[in-house]
């Protein structure tokens, strides 16, 4: 089962407006309202995590930054959770914080970040780390990816959760929202996700992601490699074989595999 357009999310955002732009009511969408618009399965999983953390303080910080006129990316903070139901998640690829830069689509400047780790909106130039991810997939399968887009919503629709450990960032300020409360929430989400339903694949690239291994109980496939950044990809990410390994393991578990050569949505 996959999700396509989510009516609750669609009512919050206008796709014709850039990230951080005012809504039809003249303001941004508060973070708490974005949580309230989540599908019921993710609200049930994430709700206890918010109760264990200082969620009101995080909301006040993010909303306050936006109210002050700072461009905060992405607009749709929980976009990844709208695309893949909890029970459909078979692979988790863990990122760090959202892209803090912008790209150009049809002459318009847009944020690179759109709520999925490593992914960018269609039309935005594919970032270097994602180019290395594509390069590894092509090497493993001996085929070129057909599309040049960096939008990974097709993977999300197949059951790949592309999750950053920090879900917001200020434009041009890398890690500007780190240590504001997101890490405790996403740690809790990972722990809960690892303890419900079927076994899953966790791809942990780089030391930041690998530090989360302690959150994961036995029974899952945990794949570790250096980060796909150009600074580290040649130290073991390229040649890691993670994508075929994930599919081999999923097939052995009786689960559907991922078509890694189809990153874009249908």
UniProtKB/Swiss-Prot annotation:
One of the record's GO molecular function terms: uracil DNA N-glycosylase activity
Subcellular location: Cytoplasm
PROSITE patterns: U_DNA_GLYCOSYLASE (PS00130)
GO biological process, one term: base-excision repair, AP site formation via deaminated base removal
Active-site residues (renumbered): 97
Keywords, sorted A to Z: Cytoplasm, DNA damage, DNA repair, Hydrolase
Family annotation (InterPro entries): UDG_fam1, Ura-DNA_Glyclase_AS, Uracil-DNA_glycosylase-like, Uracil-DNA_glycosylase-like_sf
Pfam families: UDG
A GO cellular-component term linked to this record: cytoplasm
SUPFAM superfamilies, A to Z: Uracil-DNA glycosylase-like
Chain residue ranges for the region called Disordered: 1-25
Catalytic activity: Hydrolyzes single-stranded DNA or mismatched double-stranded DNA and polynucleotides, releasing free uracil
PANTHER family: URACIL-DNA GLYCOSYLASE (PTHR11264:SF0)
Function: Excises uracil residues from the DNA which can arise as a result of misincorporation of dUMP residues by DNA polymerase or due to deamination of cytosine.
Family to which this protein belongs: Belongs to the uracil-DNA glycosylase (UDG) superfamily. UNG family.
Record-given protein name: Uracil-DNA glycosylase
Organism: Ralstonia nicotianae (strain ATCC BAA-1114 / GMI1000)
